[in-house]
């Protein structure tokens, strides 16, 4: 690992971004499947 003090590692940013995207897409599809997509 390189010196990451004071700087966020790119793999952490990628992991968090991936989780957020998957979460948002999952909530969107779950809402549409439950018939709540119109209320969102």
From Swiss-Prot:
Q: Could you tell me where this protein is found in the cell? A: Plastid, Chloroplast thylakoid membrane
Q: What UniProt keywords are attached to this protein's entry?
A: Chloroplast, Membrane, Photosynthesis, Photosystem II, Plastid, Reaction center, Thylakoid, Transmembrane, Transmembrane helix
Main location per the UniProt record = plastid
InterPro entries in the cross-refs: PSII_PsbJ (IPR002682), PSII_PsbJ_sf (IPR037267)
Q: Which domain of life is it from?
A: Eukaryota
Which regions span the lipid bilayer?
A: 8-28
| A Gene Ontology term for the protein's cellular component | photosystem II
What is a single Pfam family found in this protein's UniProt entry? Answer: PsbJ
Record carries keyword Plastid = yes
Q: Which GO terms describe its biological process?
A: photosynthesis
Record has Magnesium as a keyword: no
Topologically, how does it sit relative to the membrane?
Single-pass membrane protein
Matching PANTHER family, A to Z? Answer: PHOTOSYSTEM II REACTION CENTER PROTEIN J
Q: How does it assemble?
A: PSII is composed of 1 copy each of membrane proteins PsbA, PsbB, PsbC, PsbD, PsbE, PsbF, PsbH, PsbI, PsbJ, PsbK, PsbL, PsbM, PsbT, PsbX, PsbY, PsbZ, Psb30/Ycf12, at least 3 peripheral proteins of the oxygen-evolving complex and a large number of cofactors. It forms dimeric complexes.
Q: Which family does it belong to?
A: Belongs to the PsbJ family.
What role does it play? One of the components of the core complex of photosystem II (PSII). PSII is a light-driven water:plastoquinone oxidoreductase that uses light energy to abstract electrons from H(2)O, generating O(2) and a proton gradient subsequently used for ATP formation. It consists of a core antenna complex that captures photons, and an electron transfer chain that converts photonic excitation into a charge separation.
Q: What name appears for this protein in its UniProt entry?
A: Photosystem II reaction center protein J
Organism listed in the record: Spinacia oleracea
Encoding gene per record? psbJ
